[in-house]
Amino acid sequence: MKKTQVLLLTLFSFIGILMLVNCIINFEGTSLYQLLFWMFIAGLCESLPVYFARNRVVTVTLAVLLTLQLSHGTYFTTLVAASAAIFYLIKTEDGSFKHTFNLPYYKTMANFSNFTISAYLSGLLYDFLVDKLNISVNSPYMILVIFMYFTATFILNTVLVSVFLRIVSGSPIIETW
């Protein structure tokens, strides 16, 4: 890899790690069992991808993250999202398995950073909208806030993946997005 690629991937990973550290510092205590349970569920959802086109995959992890955002808040959600990027196991077409320990480190770090950054920033948007607009859980406007959360997570996730692919392979962002 070229030095600029390594530098950009390091910066990308560093931002994700900083956001995760911020979540750990600001995390309000929840039972360790709850945290482990949701980490397991998120890792399981990430391990069961749905292929809808060649090399195009979607998982239901976003639904788990929305559930956590509504019930536990941004910091807990980001911790679980980061763990989902690490604790997954996918069986490939040839019968082998893909997991954190047999992928190149830069792919694992990019996936980790992508999940962390998109969950954290989307969670901050959710918190901002709920707090500043004074929207309660029972408000009909909550549907709009949830839609904004989904949209922000989707856009951030896909843009970050496209940027990562641009850094690694040099392919245009628009083509990979």
Enumerate the predicted regions with their spans:
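Membrane-embedded alpha-helical hairpins and interfacial helices in multi-pass inner-membrane proteins
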Residues: M1-A42, E46-A63, S71, Y75, ...
